[in-house]
Curated annotation (Swiss-Prot):
Protein source organism: Limosilactobacillus reuteri (strain DSM 20016) (Lactobacillus reuteri)
Positions of the UniProt region annotated as Disordered: 1-52
Listed name of the protein: Large ribosomal subunit protein bL35
Molecular function GO terms recorded: structural constituent of ribosome
GO process annotations (BP): translation
Length: 65
């Protein structure tokens, strides 16, 4: 049986939380801020939790995290 490996692209983008969820950075944060309000920019700053419907898929990509 081949070695299990983490998907490196996913490992760079997602962090596992203590309760088994996943956090990731927000999209729409690299440029074109003139079209966004101050509130939108502030809310995009931190990390956000991934949707529960996708957690099963991420667990397969990152078996060791």
């Amino acid at each position: 049986m081949p070695k299990m490996k983490s998907n490196r692209a996913a490992a760079k983008r997602f962090k596992r939380t203590a309760n088994g969820g996943f956090k990731s950075g927000n999209s729409f944060t690299s440029h074109r801020f003139h079209g966004k309000t101050k509130k939108q920019r502030r809310q995009l700053r931190g990390l956000s939790m991934m949707d529960k419907t996708n957690v099963k898929r991420y667990k397969k990509l990152l078996p060791f995290k």
